[in-house]
Amino acid sequence: MSDAPIGIFDSGVGGLTVARAVLDQLPHESVLYVGDTARTPYGPRPIAQVREYSLEILDSLVASGVKALVIACNSASAAMLADARERYEGDGVPVVEVIRPAVRRAAAATRNGRIGVIGTRATISSRAYEDAFAAAPQLQLHTRACPDFVELVEDGETSGPAVLASAHAYLDPLRDAGVDTLVLGCTHYPLLAGAISYVMGEGVTLVSSAEETALDVYRTLVAHDLLRSADGARGDDGARSAPRHRFLATGDPAAFTRLARRFLGPEVDDVHDAVEVTGEIPRITAPLRGTR
């Protein structure tokens, strides 16, 4: 089981920031990534629908034989983390999410105790970050939904006048509130870090959950004795196998590949079309087990 891939799921391309951190910190592990690009963004959708879509993808990943799940989507984590853990961990598949790792880093980074959190409407309305920060009541939390950010990233627009205008509209109130640490509460948002940092100013620390989440993945694999050995498994011919990565999109694979190559590099040689889209509900048609 330790040679099985780590399953990583996001509503689109944003979770690739987490996948990149996992590849960097766990270079001997295999990754199987699914981006639900056919139904992105999740943020404006009802929580029940986000839960339904998320569990559908996670069920497919578990059926494909992944050894652990990473919910690399704040909206999904906020909507169904407890459901996912109840559904899969009893069968030996641990679940890692992205909210508490970001909270941990932000609490350590702040100097004045004023922390901003930006995310999708679904994430912000869920109050998941308020709940996660409840253990540190001395911190002052300022949250703000930034619904246009995900669509900008999914459209490949990560700089330029439209991005800067949206950043000012969403972030000026947080800057004026004096936050010194800003949690990027959506895994798409690091792709807009240039504009976000420009608007917030040099004195504000931007916190992405990617690196902390990758550390949690490592800790989880160690705790469950699932860490892949550095020299890999032996095949029938006695040779050691290298890690194998596969990235799937439920929408247009070509568009996904273009965006993915911007920050994953050579790991994305191909993106397979994971599903046949029929209206709003895709049906998995390609086996998720495989190589890149």
From Swiss-Prot:
GO MF, one annotated term: glutamate racemase activity
GO biological process: cell wall organization; peptidoglycan biosynthetic process; regulation of cell shape
Group of enzyme by EC: isomerase
Family that this chain belongs to: Belongs to the aspartate/glutamate racemases family.
Function of the molecule: Provides the (R)-glutamate required for cell wall biosynthesis.
HAMAP family reported for this sequence: Glu_racemase
Protein name: Glutamate racemase
